[in-house]
A protein has these predicted regions:
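Bacterial N-terminal signal peptides that target proteins for export
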Residues: 2-18
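Bacterial N-terminal signal peptides
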Residues: 14-28
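Short, solvent-exposed mixed-charge patches
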Residues: 449-451
Length: 451
């Protein structure tokens, strides 16, 4: 006769069951290096919308097959396609991010006014609007746009296209009749630069939807006494759950998974500078090598690469690149002889309005976004952080940097051409395996009532 109390018999059965399941539990933990991706992205990266392929001379080309020069560029990989809903009440919902945006173009205002305006802004019955972060604002950019830099008026370049979907969002170029440049269509974000730009200017990042760039802009009065001015930019308020927060996991095998975007990154970078064609070819080479166990790496598009910028970091503030230290970053000696961090290529062409639109490609500055500025009184050019670590600009795809001794554009953006690269791939969800576990049936093994 079994005199073991029912309570003890139950727990003995559970102990035996635990031992029988131990191999399964160990198997489930045997590969901690592969982060589980059985989840929906909380930070979905909206595709750039770029559909044309280009070579390095600026010509549009048929998208090349694998193994051919210039294969692997932005137009050859489709991510979350842009999708919006017009709510009919002055608001637009992004169906990928879930964010709700103001449809209309605001008047231009200072950064302080933009912050204050959000506190009292009310539209469509909502009063929880905010100034977007730089990652929220950048989610709207589309690289189907054409940069009008150098164009003086819409009559000179009537076929230009903004870097935002104007079927849903109202848009205006700079008012040339009021002395503005056509490209003066900057929008404030709420992301303040943790260092300073120019001559110690307090700086806040913004997106220019006319020329397709992220730059840091002066957010407080600048200029000599008696001649100070405060920059004004457009504002597009947003509401909804937070967007743009990474969830990095070190897989312990040279890869980093962002469980928020469901992208897997190479922990190390290219280790040296490459021109754009070389960066694409290097990516293909790594796939041929089955680098880190995968053969589906790609050069990230502009929005994918910007997603891993850490805007709480900057060389002058944290003595580091603007990226989570979970990643390895090769330091460089910059044009002024100082230790700095690289620009990184993307697969995205920065197309412009000229007859050869595709000569330039997008990069993200993970080090200082340097430029050569001449003092207002003249004299030698001075190398400065003009746009902030985390800026998105562009470089010629090929050529000699020595041909650009004082950079490019109104802030003398340094031209390197030989930028670094970091690989990305989709972190495919792991298959969900369903196990049916049969519990042992023991007489009297049910737990006693009340226990």
């Amino acid at each position: 006769m079994n005199r073991t109390p029912p309570y003890h018999r139950f727990h003995r059965a559970m102990a035996l069951l635990s031992l029988s399941l131990l191999p399964l539990l160990l198997l489930a933990q045997s590969n901690p290096g592969r982060a589980s991706t059985n989840a929906t992205a909380t930070y979905p990266i909206v595709d750039t919308g770029q559909t044309n392929c280009y070579d390095d001379t600026g010509s549009a080309i048929s998208c090349p097959a694998g193994g051919q020069p210039f294969s692997g560029q932005d137009a050859q990989h489709n991510g979350h396609q842009p999708s919006y809903t017009n709510n009919g009440d002055g608001t637009i919902t992004d169906n990928n991010t879930g964010l709700m945006w103001v449809q209309a173009v605001s008047s231009k205002m200072t950064y302080a006014a933009a912050l204050a305006g959000a506190e009292t802004f009310n539209l469509a019955g909502y009063d929880d609007w905010r100034l977007p972060t730089i990652k929220e604002l950048y989610s709207l950019i589309l690289f189907s746009g054409l940069d009008p830099s150098g164009c003086q008026s819409l009559s000179q370049c009537p076929d230009i296209v903004p870097f935002i979907n104007t079927a849903y969002f109202d848009f205006a170029y700079g008012d040339t009749s009021a002395g503005e440049r056509l490209i003066d269509a900057q929008y404030w974000s709420s992301t303040e630069y943790v260092a300073t730009t120019m001559n110690g200017d307090a700086t806040t990042f913004g997106v220019n939807f006319a020329d397709g760039r992220i730059k840091g802009y002066p957010s407080e009065p600048v200029g000599p006494p008696g001649q100070q001015f405060t920059m004004s930019s457009f504002v597009r308020y947003v509401r909804g759950s937070s967007y743009g927060v990474n969830a990095f996991v070190n897989n312990g095998d040279g890869t980093i998974t962002d469980q928020a975007t469901l992208l897997m990154w190479a922990q190390a970078d290219s280790g040296s500078g490459l021109n754009w064609e070389e960066a694409l070819a290097w990516t293909a080479q790594k796939n041929a090598e089955n680098y880190l166990g995968y053969n589906d790496w790609r050069l990230p598009n502009a929005k994918e690469l910007q997603s891993i910028v850490d805007y709480s970091r900057a060389p002058a503030a944290t003595s580091s690149a603007a990226i989570d230290p979970i990643f390895s970053v090769t330091p460089i000696t910059d044009e002024g002889g100082s230790v700095n961090y690289p620009f990184y290529w993307t697969s995205t062409t920065h197309a412009n309005w000229t007859a050869v639109p595709g000569q330039w490609s997008v990069y993200i500055a993970f080090g200082e976004a340097l430029g050569w500025m001449q003092p207002p009184t003249g004299g030698d050019y001075v190398l400065q952080d003009v746009h902030g670590a985390g800026a998105q600009r562009s470089d010629p795809k090929s050529g000699n940097p020595d041909d650009w001794p004082y950079g490019n554009g109104p802030q003398g953006d340094v031209v390197r051409i030989f930028n670094f690269a970091r690989l990305v791939r989709d972190a495919a969800p792991e298959p969900v395996v369903s196990h049916t576990i049969f519990l042992p049936t023991l007489a009297g093994s049910s737990p006693p009532a009340g226990r």
